[in-house]
């Protein structure tokens, strides 16, 4: 009887251990992608940008961190009368972000589809964008297109994306392949360099840019324990 009880307890212990996993709490990475402008100009042009980030993982599916971006945001209405404006913003952006993935909310261990989409996440944050805009040069005393070539604006990012996890020899998550779509709402008129607040062609909408990116992240540092297996 004692032998049977010991065997049962050992089995329960093994099952319990198997249902848990370890994960690294620190992640750094970067990537590149394409920006698109949604400003006072009608044509929503594309630009290129890169990013770098560092995250702290509370669990494999809940994180918070910092991100920096650098690249180009463009718009071009030169062939669209009557305004015929353009801009190229050589911007830098810095944000604090939090993300929660589906794996924190569902039991993904029961079927293959749930396991595949466990890395699907939603996130938001707060930041600052530094604008350096190349735009129409005017010699008029009263400019036809008022605005500033250099400015700073508050930035509110919303992230939607998916992570794909890859383990090391210890079955800890070591690498993450990331696809992310980010929409950035700015407070102010600096993103395109044009302040249309007193003009009849004012759009009435805040300046926004989106950023679709592909990136790779490397995880390391202290190790945490999660209640479910990641792989």
Region locations from a protein language model:
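Predominantly the C-terminal beta-signal and adjacent terminal strand-loop region
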Residues: 78, 91, 165-231
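Transmembrane beta-strands of outer-membrane beta-barrel pores
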Residues: 32-38, 68-74, 102-104, 126-132, ...
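Short loop/turn motifs that connect adjacent beta-strands in outer-membrane beta-barrel proteins
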Residues: 20-25, 61, 104-118, 166-175, ...
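Residues on the lipid-exposed face of transmembrane beta-strands in outer-membrane beta-barrel proteins
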Residues: 30-34, 52-56, 96-100, 124-128, ...
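Gram-negative (and chloroplast) outer-membrane scaffold detector with strong preference
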Residues: 62-140
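Extracellular loop and loop/strand-boundary signature of outer-membrane beta-barrel proteins
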Residues: 36-40, 77-88, 142-149, 198-204
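Short glycine/proline- and aromatic-enriched beta-strand/turn motifs that initiate or cap beta-hairpins
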Residues: 19-57, 63, 219
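Residues that define the transmembrane beta-barrel architecture of outer-membrane proteins
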Residues: 24, 44-50, 90-94, 116-118, ...
């Amino acid at each position: 009887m004692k032998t049977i009880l010991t065997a049962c307890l050992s089995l329960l212990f093994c099952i319990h251990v198997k249902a848990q996993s370890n994960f690294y709490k620190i992640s750094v990475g970067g990537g590149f992608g394409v920006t698109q402008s949604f400003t006072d100009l009608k044509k929503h042009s594309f630009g290129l940008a890169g990013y770098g980030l560092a995250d702290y993982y509370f669990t494999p599916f809940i994180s918070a961190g910092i991100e920096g971006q650098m690249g180009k945001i463009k718009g071009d209405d030169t062939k669209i009368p009557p305004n015929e404006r353009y801009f190229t913003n050589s911007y830098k952006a810095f944000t604090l972000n939090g993300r929660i993935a589906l794996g924190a909310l569902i039991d993904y261990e029961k079927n293959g589809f749930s396991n595949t989409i466990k890395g699907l996440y939603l996130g938001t944050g707060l930041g600052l964008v530094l604008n350096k805009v190349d735009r129409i040069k005017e010699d008029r005393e009263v400019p036809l297109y008022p605005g500033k070539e250099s400015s700073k604006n508050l930035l509110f990012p919303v992230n939607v994306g998916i992570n794909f996890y890859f383990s090391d020899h210890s079955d800890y998550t070591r690498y993450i392949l990331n696809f992310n779509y980010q929409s950035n709402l700015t407070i102010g008129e600096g993103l395109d360099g044009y302040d249309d607040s007193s003009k009849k062609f004012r759009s009435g909408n805040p300046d926004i840019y989106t950023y679709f990116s592909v990136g790779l992240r490397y995880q390391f540092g202290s190790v945490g324990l999660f209640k479910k297996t990641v792989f």
